[in-house]
Amino acid sequence: MEEHNNELLQRFLTYVAFDTQSKSSAKHSPSSAGQMKLALHLQQELIELGLQDVNVTKHAVVTAYLPSNHPDLTHTIGFISHLDTSPQCSGKNVQPEVIENYRGGDIALGLGEEFISPVYYPFLHQLIGKTLIVTDGTTLLGADNKAGIAEIMTALSVLQRENIPHCNIRVAFTPDEEIGLGMYYFPLDDFPCDWAYTIDGGEVGELEYENFNAATAKITFKGRGIHPGYAKNKLVNALTLACEFQQGFPKDDVPEKTSGKEGFFHLDDFKGDIEKVELHFLIRDFDQAKFKQRKAFIYQLVEKFNREKSLKDPVECVIEDSYKNMYDTVKNVPQAIELADAAMKACGITPNHKPIRGGTDGAFLAEKGLACPNIFTGGYNFHSKHELVTLEGMEKAVEVVIKIANCKDL
């Protein structure tokens, strides 16, 4: 076990040294050069581990295959993690700090003023005695999703080194998951699986197979500028129109006031001037019928606004779907959930089924017909300078991946 932990830790520390922060404004993938550098590094490691069909596409998608070594394990399972880190926080020059046998209380991050406190993060009380990996307070850590990469790679290493019986295994590492481009160039024809798992969750025990239905709405207001001293009956202020329009949304139907399986509208961007304004809304709901109602609500609100204002330039609205709830696909492959549950229980873990209040690469794969639930990594506080992961949680993820691959003993 200690040998596995040392390997796991070293892999993780190696991977977070790559600056793979994705760029929100990018129209191509990979959106950052560091992702391709990490992809090529992983390609070499996979070859050294003895995997077959190891490929890296021009879009930095890494795929590899490990054939079954047991005649009774003929099915194929995929494991997926993403290369990039969030654009919300710097991922350059990450300096991890390893805290062995955490004794509780505040954790100072580096030499600055940043710290992590159980007052703000009560889950820290559950981590006393664990080995924590934290940041120096200037960057994110990159456990999302390099912990997942390290866990998959370590599991492959253990399977090979100890000759543990396993099914056919497909592995993929994808770019730009954080900006929604992760599956855009995914070579699905080169990744034939009965089902797959993303290793991209949070605390130990998380098993996620429901996510938001998601769409974005772009609403455009056109105004007419003129000198404000002579503006009576002439000026049309697009900024004022946009503010008034936004007041038509339900006040409590927002991210900061919803949880669980509750959906929301989220004003994500407001940009422009007197002559033109664009509002960007995120539309989210788990229930397909309610999701359709939310999109209809916005169209109706625009129609009503245009009717009441009699504008020369009517408000324009374009709504585009982003991804769907993966449960519509996963429910048809119940063994994907049953196997993950059994593997966790065999590792002494109580499965925690919870909805994803977001999306994953698995949601996009589900649209293509591949069931792909999400499994924990052992990390917390993703996308922030307070991000951390426990070495013990990562080791549990390795054990679960191995158990899933070696499902004949479950």
Question: Where are the language model's segments positioned?
Answer:
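N-terminal capping segment at the start of a domain
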Residues: 5-33, 134, 323, 380-384
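A non-catalytic alpha/beta surface segment that caps or lines the substrate-entry region
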Residues: 27-74, 78-80, 84, 95
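Short, conserved micro-motifs enriched in small and acidic residues
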Residues: 33, 139-150, 232-240, 388-395
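Active-site metal-coordination/substrate-binding segment of hydrolases
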Residues: 73-168
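Midchain, well-structured core segments that form catalytic/ion-binding scaffolds
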Residues: 116, 124, 130-143, 175-299, ...
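Short helix-loop-beta-strand segments that form the rim/entrance of peptidase-like active sites
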Residues: 157-179, 259-260
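Metal-dependent amide/peptide-bond hydrolase catalytic core
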Residues: 239-410
